[in-house]
Amino acid sequence: MQRPFVIILLGAPGAGKGTQAVRLAAARGLPHVSTGDLFRENLKLETPLGKQAKGYMESGWLVPDELVLDMLFARVARPDCVRGYVLDGFPRTLPQAQAFGERLGRIEPIVIDFVVRDATIVERAAGRLTCKACGNIQHARFAPPRVAGKCDRCSAELVQRPDDAPAVVTERLRVYHEQTQPLVGYYQTAGVLRELDGEQSPEAVFRSLMGLLPPQEAA
Ligand code: AP5
């Protein structure tokens, strides 16, 4: 059996990880595992985990590692992840990366670092629109809805994420530089990091991303 194909999308909040993860997962037939989406699902369902994560997310802070790791490990243990998966928003701290590395053992992940300037991040967060029903990501300027306020994919309502408020975005960026950016050096040292220019159009980013990945092996 082939080794699982584990792709980690690293980058600042709003760098375009979610947008590209959906496309990449579809292109490679792999599940898209987003810790942010998993937490938002838990928030919506008002689970104990969602209640614990709520305050951290609303403030732009990271949820404590132990909560993230339990949730993530349970998700990637599901049968749909056996051939691999696309990780979006995980790992985000050195302890998360180390714990995940131990779990992967001899499997080497491919880590893609989305390089995007802070000014671009602020602009993208300010205009982001997310579908309440299917989670599709659009943007008021860069991916405008065909019908105002409605999702292009399923026509449900598009909303702004509460953590895209300007003050929270500033805090998320600060937290990113302090706690997540050190992972770039960590994975560089491990020899598994590939840099991606995330300032290009979504289509050009996708082409560059596919160019950084090895060709898909036959099943
Ligand atoms: P999470 O949901 O992971 O948020 P994030 O990493 O902050 O990333 P975003 O979803 O904001 O951005 P993205 O890079 O996916 O960009 P997108 O494609 O949407 O996490 C939320 C919270 O959960 C965290 O703050 C934390 O509290 C908690 N959490 C999650 N994981 C955790 C972990 N591992 N540890 C601890 N806590 C955790 O794009 C943004 C916008 O730009 C969109 O509108 C899009 O249309 C547009 N856009 C995208 N690409 C382009 C482009 N190339 N050109 C123009 N516009 C573009």
Regions inferred by a protein language model and the residue ranges of each:
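Glycine-rich phosphate-binding loop of ATP-dependent small-molecule kinases
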Residues: 1-219
